[in-house]
């Protein structure tokens, strides 16, 4: 492969992966409206060998340095040649919208004025196993919550020092004063009105739900990475808001399509509260 094609391949690969993520996020948002479960949809379409399972997880949007940078770089390069990459423009627009999803869900649940409310946020880095905060969805969520008047307690297994540095640049002094950097996941929950999960760290996948419930003022979880099964969370007494897991309102609405006899949903692994 020649050098120019090799360089193009690197950018094209990241653009393709970003496109898969944004498409799944669009489908997840529609699934919430119609009462479908995007996790079931993911498994279904991923079983098609033409598609595969990689990068089909819906969530709170992508971040980091590579995907955003490479998508924009390809679009800018196309512009210099008088071309417009419409799909990649849409991929970026969808991702920017998706990074605001958790904030919209929280504001939709509690109203636009969050003065006097306190939220716990688990996960600050843009993905697990790094402290990289570049274009991390958590930064968007924190700005939304703080500018609506809330206070927050944040925790990340690795990114706390980098988060402190980054948020000092992101936030106004009065906003930063309403951020507490917690020492542990449960420490972040103390007195919170709800928990928001933004990064899919392994440490968050199998928590002690009894302790979570005891620490929160109300058992409410906004899960931006679909770590848990809605049916199991309901059995444990949590109000659970995932991404594309199908709202109760939509599920209760009549469908024009014939429906199979109802069957009790189970978690993806017997006895497990977490996804595969």
Language model regions located:
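Structural/interface elements that position substrates and couple domains in central-metabolism enzymes
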Residues: 1-276
């Amino acid at each position: 492969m020649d050098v120019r094609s090799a360089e193009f391949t690197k950018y094209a690969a990241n653009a393709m992966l970003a496109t898969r993520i944004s498409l799944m996020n669009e489908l997840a948002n529609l699934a919430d409206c119609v009462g479908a479960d995007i996790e079931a949809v993911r498994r279904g379409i991923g079983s098609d060998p033409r598609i595969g399972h990689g990068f089909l997880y819906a969530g709170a949007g992508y971040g980091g340095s590579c995907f955003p940078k490479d998508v924009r770089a390809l679009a800018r390069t196309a512009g210099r040649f008088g071309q417009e990459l419409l799909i990649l423009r849409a991929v970026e627009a969808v991702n920017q919208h998706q990074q605001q999803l958790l904030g919209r869900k929280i504001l939709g649940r509690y109203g636009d004025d969050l003065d006097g409310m306190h939220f716990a946020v688990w996960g600050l880095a843009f993905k697990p196993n790094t402290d990289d905060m570049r274009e991390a969805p958590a930064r968007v969520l924190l700005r939304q919550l703080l500018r609506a008047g809330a206070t927050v307690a944040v925790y990340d297994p690795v990114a706390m020092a980098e988060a402190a540095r980054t948020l000092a640049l992101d936030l106004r002094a009065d906003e930063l004063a309403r951020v507490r950097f917690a020492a542990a996941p449960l420490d972040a929950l103390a007195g919170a009105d709800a928990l928001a999960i933004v990064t899919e760290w392994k440490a968050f996948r199998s928590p002690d739900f009894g302790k979570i419930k005891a620490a929160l003022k109300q058992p409410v979880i906004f899960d931006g990475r679909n770590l848990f099964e809605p049916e199991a969370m309901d059995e444990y007494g949590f109000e659970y808001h995932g991404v594309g897991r199908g709202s109760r309102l939509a599920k209760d609405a009549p469908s024009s399509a014939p429906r199979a006899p109802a069957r009790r949903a189970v978690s993806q692994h017997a006895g497990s509260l977490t996804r595969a």
